[in-house]
């Protein structure tokens, strides 16, 4: 700190006679077309000076401005700039700020960037027009505060736009989901109505399964039973139908012959199982289906299993 103060004091006699030479700063010229997201540009305005300068943003130091740009803009002699003292805590190289490189002796004054505090300390060593107002303007840094505020406002607006876009997508997806759920519930309701209609039809048809006036014995083991089994024979394209009938004890033994290889279609008490079997065969014959008798009360019919099931149910419901 003392070396800096004495250097400033000793340089005071020299800076009065130093003249500004703009050509001396040409060595630091930067292509205006070159663009970088790290090194930005701004305009400094304080009467009678208006000039552009470069700056970078550092997480700890804040905005650091180009030393050469300010000295050139304020018409400070390049010779004086070369002999001035720098506070290395507040005046750092570009590589240190951007790349995190370790401190080193600068190869060029053009790579030096100073914090607001460091820039004020540096400019205090020189004489230039309207010096006090310029130092106040640099220290105040109103333009930077305004830019920061604008950046924050822009970031908030962008965030709001993103939220609006996401909200629109969410609302659209929610509407689509509601429509899809509504459609599913309508389908479910239609299926329930169809099932209810079928159940009502079966309930109405159930009394016809037992002929009027039929009285079963009190001994349930004497009740006649009938079971109809079906199975598809794919190689011949036919359906095999087996009948198991009789009282409970014999019925249980007979149906064991068919339970492993076939699916049961009808099973229950029947007032007259033999009559029911004849009615089933008659329905197949009336439908134009060829019937082939096999051993053990099994027949083959040239139709699909679903068609055979419908014919069997029709025969039992209408004629038993």
From Swiss-Prot:
The lineage of its organism: Viruses, Viruses incertae sedis, Naldaviricetes, Lefavirales, Baculoviridae. It comes from the Viruses. This is Uncharacterized 36.6 kDa protein.
């Amino acid at each position: 700190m003392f070396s800096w103060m004495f250097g400033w004091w000793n340089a005071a006699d020299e800076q009065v006679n130093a003249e500004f030479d703009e050509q001396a700063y040409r060595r630091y010229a930067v292509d205006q077309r070159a663009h970088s997201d790290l090194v930005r540009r701004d305009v400094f305005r304080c009467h009678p000076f208006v000039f552009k300068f470069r700056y970078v943003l550092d997480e700890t130091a804040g905005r650091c401005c180009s030393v050469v740009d300010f000295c050139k803009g304020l018409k400070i002699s390049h010779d004086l700039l070369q002999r001035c003292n720098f506070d290395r805590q507040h005046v750092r190289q570009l590589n240190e700020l951007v790349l995190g490189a370790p401190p080193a002796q600068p190869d060029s004054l053009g790579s030096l960037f100073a914090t607001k505090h460091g820039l004020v300390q540096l400019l205090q060593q020189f004489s230039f027009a309207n010096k006090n107002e310029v130092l106040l303007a640099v220290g105040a840094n109103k333009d930077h505060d305004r830019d920061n505020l604008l950046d924050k406002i822009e970031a908030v607006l962008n965030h709001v736009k993103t939220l609006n876009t996401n909200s629109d997508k969410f609302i659209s997806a929610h509407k689509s989901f509601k429509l899809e759920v509504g459609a599913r519930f309508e389908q479910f309701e239609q299926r329930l109505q169809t099932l209810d209609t079928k159940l009502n039809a079966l309930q109405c048809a159930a009394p016809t399964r037992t002929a009027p006036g039929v009285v079963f014995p009190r001994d349930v083991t004497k009740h006649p039973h009938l079971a109809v089994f079906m199975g598809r024979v794919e190689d011949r394209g036919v359906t095999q139908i087996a009948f198991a009938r009789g009282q409970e004890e014999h019925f249980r033994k007979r149906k064991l012959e068919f339970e492993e290889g076939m699916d049961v279609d009808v099973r229950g008490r029947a007032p007259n199982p033999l009559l029911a079997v004849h009615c089933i065969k008659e329905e197949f014959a009336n439908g134009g289906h060829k019937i082939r008798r096999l051993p053990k009360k099994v027949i083959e019919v040239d139709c699909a299993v679903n068609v055979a099931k419908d014919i069997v149910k029709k025969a039992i419901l209408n004629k038993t």
